[in-house]
Amino acid sequence: MRHAVSWFEMPVTDIDRAVAFYTTILGTRLAGIAEADGRRYAMFPAEDGVSGAIVQGEGYVPSTEGTLVFLNVGDVLQPVVDRVEAAGRQVLLPRMHMGEFGVAAFIVDTEGNKVALHAMA
């Protein structure tokens, strides 16, 4: 199946801190930190479908404005929201019902990005 999105990049200012945060809340490892063209990046798992990376480099500025990336957190949302709160991060919207499309929560990551977490329950 063809996806409307093929890749995403989320800007970070401290890639080591961001890798630790996403590893903790998602319960999965990001690919090791790589470097290319003056940027440092770590990729999210890409087993099925679309993936992306967190990227540190010139011109990559974290923000709560603009495009909102929805990360697939598996079947159940609440345990991931709990890990975000335990990590001391802000939960902007703890649970938003999306009808047949599941549920989502909006958070602010360690870098200042607004990110959505998506699950079916």
Task: Describe every region a protein language model picked out.
Residues 44-48, 107-110, 120:
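Active-site beta-strand termini and strand-to-loop segments that position acidic
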Residues 2, 9-51:
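Core segments of cupin and vicinal oxygen chelate
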Residues 18-22, 84, 112:
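Conserved active-site tyrosine of GNAT-family acetyltransferases
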Residues 36-40, 98-103:
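Short acidic/glycine-enriched loop/turn segments that link adjacent beta-strands
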Residues 5-13, 59-85, 103-108:
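Vicinal oxygen chelate
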